[in-house]
Amino acid sequence: LAVATGEPDYRLAANRFWDSVTLRRMTITGHTGPRPEHEAFGEDYELPNNGYYESCAACGLMDFAQRMFLLEGGADSGDVLERVLYNAVMHGISLDGTNSYYQNPLSDTNRNRYNSWVCCPPNLSRTLFQVGRYAYAAGDRDAFLNLFVAGTVQLPMKGGSVGLKIQTEYPW
């Protein structure tokens, strides 16, 4: 709502929530929501290694980080995008890519691949499919690269567009 309306109170609320999540309720790997009840946040700094950390929460945090970048700019939202993508989102997918996980505790090595929830597989797929939306952004006169991913993109800008070609082997 803050981006769509420009309402200052919404902007302040978004920034307060962003700070609460990223400074006090997110693990170093970008996971959030340690409580199994409603995949909920806990108290400030409640970040246990055996927390719940649902895959869809990681996808949602990427969406929130992208919107905060559009609202405020700044490197912190790009840093969160990168941390969550390469750690929390990818943690929800098996190494062979054939399974996904609903829960992603940091210290558990025996995760159950089957669950009755059907939200995570398509949400993880959607997030990975849209990585370009998270990687690039443009303003009237500025182009932004939030994720180091190889690719080519044409970004609309005031009075035209700019093309970018990114060559990298990062993060591999």
Regions found by a protein language model. Give the residues of each.
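Glycan-recognition and catalytic cores of secretory/periplasmic carbohydrate-active enzymes
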Residues: 1-172
